[in-house]
A protein has these predicted regions:
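Generic recognition of well-ordered alpha-helical segments
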Residues: 2, 32, 36, 40, ...
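Conserved P-loop NTPase motor "coupling/switch" region that bridges the ATPase
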Residues: 1-46
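Cytochrome P450 catalytic domain signature, combining two hallmark sequence patches
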Residues: 79-86
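Alpha-helical structural signal
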Residues: 37-38, 96, 146, 180, ...
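Conserved Helicase C-terminal RecA-like lobe
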Residues: 49-74, 87-206, 277, 283-296
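SF2 helicase/translocase ATPase core recognition
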Residues: 1-13, 50-78, 179, 183, ...
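Soluble or luminal CAZymes and related metallo-dependent hydrolases
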Residues: 25-33, 41, 98, 122-129, ...
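Short glycine/proline- and charge-enriched loop/turn segments
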Residues: 15-21, 162-169, 211-212, 216
Length: 296
């Protein structure tokens, strides 16, 4: 808006920059774009500003769906693929919000089918793995931040913590500002070892350096939101190395989300230093690719 025409018309930008960089991986065009925008971008990287921070170790932890959970996932994938393959381009464009809702339901099955199916009595591979990680961490004297996009999933995990005799705090969007700050102060000072936080409610503005383990229960389209959540523990005042676990349902859409995050983040960071999920801008074939499952 301040410099109209600086990056040409969209058609010219698409032909000279976007397609060569995004589709063809043209390094020369990428460097050309970098040179053009570098004078207008101010980046402050935590690794450069806070060189005395302890290490941050990130690990993807995979859980394999089995039994009834796997059957429900496969059935939902097949239904979505049949729906997408039968749509015209016009229908696809007009129904992207509904398609995104279906993808969200698929992610919920990965988390725990009980989020969708009230009568579900089977297991959740990720919930079992998450509880094992938390129990081991608490047993070793660590404090844990547990993030999920789904508040209903946090409630199910909290029930598991209660059953295991592990104390916790719970922060969702329904918690008022005063109560929120009270919980933050208490967690940093007392012996309660787990803080369950919805990603949207607690992704920014909290200082929780008493924790040195962060668990992301479900990957989200926007990796920047997850990074901001991790930074509730990995920030000024942190004295210990921070271990970050990202739980992923193996051979599912969650693996595809992580790959998409990495690809989008790599491209965006090369240009500006930020990343964002672009699910609503996907083409039908790209969405179908998200649903593909490797052959056993």
């Amino acid at each position: 808006y301040l410099m109209p025409g600086f990056l040409y018309t969209y058609q010219r930008f698409r032909e000279e920059i976007e397609i060569p960089v995004v589709v063809n991986g043209d390094e020369n065009r990428m460097q050309r774009l970098q040179r053009m925008i570098r004078p207008f971008i101010l980046r402050r990287l935590k690794g450069e500003v806070l060189r005395d921070l302890p290490a941050k170790l990130e690990e993807n932890v995979f859980a394999k769906l089995e039994g009834e959970q796997l059957a429900l996932y496969d059935a939902h994938v097949q239904r979505m693929k049949e729906s997408l393959e039968g749509k015209s381009e016009k229908e696809f464009r007009s129904e992207k919000i509904q398609i995104l809702a279906e993808l969200t339901r698929l992610r919920q099955i990965c988390c725990d089918p009980g989020l969708l199916f009230e009568g579900y009595k089977g297991e959740s591979a990720k919930a079992q793995m998450c509880m094992e990680l938390i129990e081991n961490a608490v047993g070793a004297g660590h404090k844990v931040l547990l993030f999920s996009q789904f508040t209903s999933m946090l409630e199910r995990l909290a029930a598991g913590l209660k059953k295991a005799g592990i104390d916790y705090y719970m922060l969702t969007g329904s918690v008022g500002k005063e109560k929120r700050m009270q919980m933050v102060e208490s967690f940093n000072e007392d012996d309660v070892p787990v803080f369950c936080i919805s990603l949207k409610a607690g992704g920014t503005g909290l200082n929780l350096t008493a924790a040195d383990i962060v668990i992301h229960y479900d990957p989200w389209w926007n990796v920047a939101a997850q990074n901001q959540a991790t930074d509730r523990a990995y920030r000024i005042g942190q004295q210990n190395p921070v271990q970050v676990y990202k739980l992923i349902a193996q051979d599912t859409i969650e693996e595809k989300i992580v790959a998409l995050q990495q690809a989008k983040q790599s491209l965006a960071e090369t240009v500006t230093g930020s990343a964002d999920g672009a699910i609503l801008s996907m083409k039908p074939e790209e969405l179908l690719e998200l649903l593909e499952v490797p052959e056993p």
